[in-house]
Amino acid sequence: MSRQPPIRIGARGSKLSLAQSGLMQARIAHALGVPAGASKDEIEAAAPLIPIVTSGDRIQDRRLMEIGGKGLFTKEIEEALLDGRIDCAVHSLKDMPAELPPGLVLAATPEREDPRDAFISHVCERLEDLPKGARLGTASLRRQAQALHVRPDLEIVMLRGNVDTRLAKLERGEADAILLAQSGLNRLGLGHLTRSWLDPDACPPAPGQGALVIETRAEDIGAPWLEAVRCRQTTIAVAAERGALLALEGSCRTAIGARAILDGARLSMIVEALTPDGAQRFRREGDITLTGADDIAEARAFGLTLGAEVRAAGGDAIILPE
């Protein structure tokens, strides 16, 4: 492939976001014609990283639901995309709202990392083994609800901040254990800190967890370099999960888990929503055989169906009051 004009990559300024964007930067540069084994300068020239500080990064002392939701991690980046200051953005898919601003699309999803939630503690090996009344640190309503469903005696400690900040709070004794995405730990070279994992069938992760996604302007979705970084299997699975997210009107005020697995043409899926206190859980699971006509649309429709069934069962009980 001949060299193309540079593709400017927008990314949050956090260590994890820059690590994730750096992983994609080399792949994008290669897709643009930069040879394997090229120097960092050559890669940077073809696909420069443009760090952008978001509102979600600046405000660290409150839950996302209190300050505007997931969109606070993407607002400034999406404005830069629409203004033409950057050409694409790399995000953690789990942080993306169910609906995007007009003119923007999720254009490519590469191979997924480990989607599980990691349990980290100096007290014990597993969530189930925590002492009665132990403090569990998380800012995720889903992780809170799933943990309380298993262990209603736990005290939930609000723990926002980047991965290093959360680990430091654990070291200082502000919590007895914390839950983090294993994918983020792996990308930061911290996977060895995990003591165990939440069972992804019993506690499905957030829709899209473990997957990165490249967001572009709608008119750029057919660019050849995007095709070079797409993973069909991941794209189909996350289409189902995000379909469920949309049906459940997912936000930071709803505790939603979804896990889809593609095996050949068979797509299986678990979707659940819980009340914020974990006392009630509404769950649906099933599988379909994809026809091959439009696998992504079929997967999304499957997710929408299961999500709608969970929404009908849970009603307003699954939404945290404002």
Curated annotation (Swiss-Prot):
Q: Which cofactor does it need?
A: dipyrromethane
Q: Which residues carry this modification: S-(dipyrrolylmethanemethyl)cysteine?
A: 252
Coiled coil (residue ranges):
none
Pathways involved: Porphyrin-containing compound metabolism; protoporphyrin-IX biosynthesis; coproporphyrinogen-III from 5-aminolevulinate: step 2/4
Give the CC-aspect GO terms: cytoplasm
Q: Which GO terms describe its biological process?
A: protoporphyrinogen IX biosynthetic process
Which enzyme class?
A: transferase
User: Could you confirm whether the keyword Cell cycle appears in this record?
Assistant: no
- Transferase found in the keyword field: yes
GO terms assigned for molecular function: hydroxymethylbilane synthase activity
- Entry EC number(s): 2.5.1.61
| Cofactor notes | Binds 1 dipyrromethane group covalently.
* Reaction(s) catalysed (UniProt annotation): 4 porphobilinogen + H2O = hydroxymethylbilane + 4 NH4(+)
Listed A to Z, the keywords are:
Porphyrin biosynthesis, Transferase
Top-level taxonomic group: Bacteria
What other facts are recorded? The porphobilinogen subunits are added to the dipyrromethane group.
Entry's family note: Belongs to the HMBS family.
Concerning PANTHER family, the annotation shows: PORPHOBILINOGEN DEAMINASE (PTHR11557:SF0)
Write out the function statement from the record: Tetrapolymerization of the monopyrrole PBG into the hydroxymethylbilane pre-uroporphyrinogen in several discrete steps.
**Assembly notes:** Monomer.
Protein name per its UniProtKB record: Porphobilinogen deaminase
Q: Which organism is it from?
A: Caulobacter vibrioides (strain NA1000 / CB15N) (Caulobacter crescentus)
Gene name, Swiss-Prot/TrEMBL: hemC
